[in-house]
UniProtKB/Swiss-Prot annotation:
The active site is at 170 (acyl-thioester intermediate). Belongs to the LipB family. GO terms for cellular component: cytoplasm. One of its GO terms (molecular function) is lipoyl(octanoyl) transferase activity. It comes from Bordetella parapertussis (strain 12822 / ATCC BAA-587 / NCTC 13253). InterPro entries: aa-tRNA-synth_II/BPL/LPL (IPR045864), BPL_LPL_catalytic (IPR004143), Octanoyltransferase (IPR000544), Octanoyltransferase_CS (IPR020605). Substrate binds at residues 66-73, 139-141, 152-154. Pfam families: LplA-B_cat. It is an enzyme of class 2 (transferase). Pathway: Protein modification; protein lipoylation via endogenous pathway; protein N(6)-(lipoyl)lysine from octanoyl-[acyl-carrier-protein]: step 1/2. In the reaction, the free carboxyl group of octanoic acid is attached via an amide linkage to the epsilon-amino group of a specific lysine residue of lipoyl domains of lipoate-dependent enzymes. Transmembrane segments: none annotated. This is Octanoyltransferase.
Length: 220
């Protein structure tokens, strides 16, 4: 199921809802994708180090249980929270992250951003800049508990990027961030979110089908 949350969504409330959903689910619980746009907030993951918060100013900082370092969420960015049963899909965490990245790349290609790419050793999606620099356009951070995943990814659409200057994004000093608008792609948060959710649902559904076929002894 794909659903939009009320906007702007309070980060703490959504995080609590994800934890409650994950704690209550069982083997038969349907997977869900939650789409939202957050009010301005910095989030610091489990590996987050306070020295990467350079100048948060008046923007709230939330320490959360996802993987990764520090990032920023705000208006003009779409969040896709993927509440997936990884055991049902037969996915290890690294395979799951790979699936999220591939779905994001497919979404960006749909939107006309063909040059988006991955960066070895640095989760997320990047866009080459003049001079060869890679600027980050999508960030990933996941949590897996008892085989159930939550949190997900953030894709920059058309936003005020200046709050990223108050941090070392994802723990990388000097890492540049961009959005679709800066790359010459004009679209809405709603359209980008729907395309992203469709790609995520398709990729995860395919993994679930392959796992079911393997368990049944049917060639994939």
């Amino acid at each position: 199921m794909i659903k939009w949350l009320a906007r702007p969504a309070d980060y703490g409330s959504v995080w609590d809802a994800m934890k409650a959903f994950t704690a209550a689910r069982g083997p038969g619980t349907a997977d869900e994708i939650w789409l939202c746009e957050h009010a301005p907030v910095y989030t610091l993951g489990q590996a987050g180090r306070p020295e990467h918060l350079l100048n948060p100013g008046l923007i709230p900082v939330v320490h959360c249980d996802r993987g990764g370092q520090v990032t920023y969420h705000g208006p003009g960015q779409v969040l896709a929270y993927t509440l997936f049963d990884l055991r049902r899909a037969g996915l290890y965490v690294r395979e799951y992250v790979d699936m999220l990245e591939q779905a994001t790349l497919a979404t960006l290609r749909e939107l006309g951003l063909e040059q988006a790419c991955r960066k070895p050793g640095a989760p997320g999606i990047y866009v080459p800049q003049p001079g060869g620099e890679l600027a980050k356009i999508a960030a990933l951070g996941v949590k897996v508990r008892n085989g159930y995943a939550y949190h997900g990814l953030a894709l920059n659409i058309d936003m005020d990027l200046s709050p990223f200057l108050g941090i070392n994004p994802c723990g990388y000093e000097g890492l540049r961030t961009v959005d679709l608008a800066a790359c010459g792609v004009r679209t809405s948060v709603e359209r980008a979110g729907e395309l992203l959710a469709a790609q995520l649902a398709r990729a995860h559904g395919h993994a679930v089908q392959q796992r079911a076929a393997a368990l049944a002894g049917v060639p994939g």
